[in-house]
Amino acid sequence: MALPVYYDKDIDLGVIQSLQVGIIGYGAQGEAQALNLRDSKVKVRIGLYQGSLSVPKAKAEGFEVLEVKELVQQSDLIMALLPDELHKEVLEKEVIPFLKEGQIVGFAHGFSVHFNQVVLPKGVGAILVAPKGPGSALREEYLKNRGLYHLIAIEQESSKNNAKAVALSYAKAMGGGRMGVLETSFKEECESDLFGEQAVLCGGLEAIIRMGFETLIKAGYPEELAYFECVHEVKLVADLLHYKGVEGLRKHISNTAEFGAIKNREPMGNLLEKRMQKILKKIQNGSFAKDFLLEKSLNYPRLNTERKALKETKIEQIGEILRAPFNHKK
């Protein structure tokens, strides 16, 4: 691997166990991280605003809940596990004014720091600890004595605590050292994560799926078959890729499927490459971040419109019917 990678044997869990951790937010990541930390014998409190719907849940799970500014004053490490677009507002009002030299502020994504939405005072550490998976998977893997890959990065050193040692120890407490903790930078994590979401995992994949579905529908094929071939079977392929890689996927599909993929890969790739380069450029030069923060300031008009429109599409309507048996089994 090109990146430095650390495992449990390389990391001192005692570093994070000696500190008081405060987690701001109790969504999927906040809950999973807090539970994993507590099970790793780490002292952790939760910071939420008065009236937050998450307060009863956090208290029911045995955590002490404080207002954010109180949490900051009583913590050595403060983890900001909030949506990216809320970091500037919350940290400028409730966190930064109460920070002291030697404390560390942690993030699960580099967006707000890399794009200068959050600038921490000198002497306050800035670390990134990013589990490569959703909160549900982070918790499930920990309970199975396994873990997810984690990324760490150091943007600013603390005047009191070694920021890298704290980041590594935090990742170990969440189970990351069981799989591997890779060291990167805020810039690399942020830009590659945004690119992956936009060009492949969310934007690119959804675009190809919906385009494939609509192509078959317009050609007169039944909606059910279009859904099976363009949506339903994506999981089968994704699982093969996840566990066996591209070569392993090739070995598990038919010769017909493999030949068809190879034959059409180049023309499709040529079309996608230029678009992907444009996507990456807009991420790198900050124009995507600017557009996203403007969307937030206007109360998400485009997101709300798109979400409403998606419910009315054929792909969602037939999908809801075909997914019903799977959801019923849960």
Curated annotation (Swiss-Prot):
One GO cellular component, as annotated: cytosol
Keyword line: Amino-acid biosynthesis, Branched-chain amino acid biosynthesis, Magnesium, Metal-binding, NADP, Oxidoreductase
Active site: 109
Annotated residues for binding of Mg(2+) 1: 193, 197
Gene Ontology MF, one: ketol-acid reductoisomerase activity
All copies of domain KARI C-terminal knotted, residue ranges: 185-329
Keyword Oxidoreductase part of the UniProt annotation: yes
Protein name stated in the entry: Ketol-acid reductoisomerase (NADP(+))
